[in-house]
């Protein structure tokens, strides 16, 4: 019972985030960060709680899984997991994104599988599109500097607009979650895993 309640809370949170993100609209003013009103936030949470209450244990468990697939098109296995196990999301890797038009179609197929079965909950479609050397969606998408170069300018607008346009490109493909930016600090010169993915060595510069 405790484990089920914990899963339910996680699903409520995920649904609230997905619903909030889908309603942010165009963000052209700089800097502007979406601040949901208390009434809107309360309504979304209540909607998520009603949805979770209607889920079977299989649906509830499936919502905490984020899976991937090999190749350019969704495998029969991933589509089965979406329809029958009601997984919460799919991770897009570079090997899924060699053709952007095909990727867009594939995401549409997976979202249709999710929204035409069970409780019709849309998927989180996630990727890693940090800019710099971490860019899983290539093709005609923008080539941007790494975070270290952006941080060196000390211009928040550079960081803002880089993130804005990366987000717009991902959104046009149907990707609604980006595991970015990296907020680790640049603490060691030989920290090769982070390196230029960090904005700065100062935590206050990285996240003022």
State each model region's role.
Residues 25-37:
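Signal peptide processing junction and immediate N-terminal pro/mature segment
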